[in-house]
Regions:
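Conserved alpha/beta-domain cores
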Residues: 2-160
Length: 160
């Protein structure tokens, strides 16, 4: 357990310092898109100026056979599409899936500076958030990110 005096210290050597104030930007519209669908990805430049958040969905809306293609498509979007003032978020696979670790590792190390928030679905308790927070700090340090990626926990179960 971390002491309160350490709250604003990075969780890993070389990780970006945690934000002292959460940046609040009102969000009227979040557009979810499937990164493995090339037709939808082609429409993103027209959609981006009309939304506050663009969210690449890697979770339940993506069939198991398309998980890796969706992850690669999301990273390609993060690297190549001009987001302007629109935030880029992603909803990764749940922590009990075989894809969650690969999602987090690839997103942060290959395109981390492009992402504002990572949604963690099906959070069961504080231990899930602590795990992802610590892992994210290590990956941010490894990738030498200039800013931390924020987490958005989704509580979807009776325990969560």
């Amino acid at each position: 357990m971390r002491h309160a005096r350490d709250f604003f210290k990075p969780l890993a050597v070389g990780a970006p310092e945690p934000l002292r104030d959460i940046p609040f930007r009102p969000s009227r519209m979040i557009h979810f898109f499937p990164p493995s669908n090339d037709k939808m990805v082609a429409k993103l430049p027209d959609i981006i100026p009309t939304v506050d958040i663009l969210l690449g969905n890697l979770e339940d809306g993506v069939p198991a056979s398309d998980k890796e293609a969706a992850r690669a498509g999301l990273i390609r979007v993060a690297r190549t599409v001009d987001m302007g003032a629109t935030q880029l978020w992603t909803r990764v696979n749940s922590l009990d899936s075989p894809w969650a670790l690969d999602d987090l590792t690839a997103i942060v190390t290959e395109a981390g500076n492009a992402f504002d928030v990572i949604m963690i679905p099906k959070v069961e308790g504080p231990e899930d958030i602590h795990y992802v927070d610590r892992l994210l700090a290590q990956l941010e340090a490894k990738a030498r990110l200039s800013k931390p990626i924020l987490l958005h926990a989704i509580l979807e179960t009776a325990r969560g």
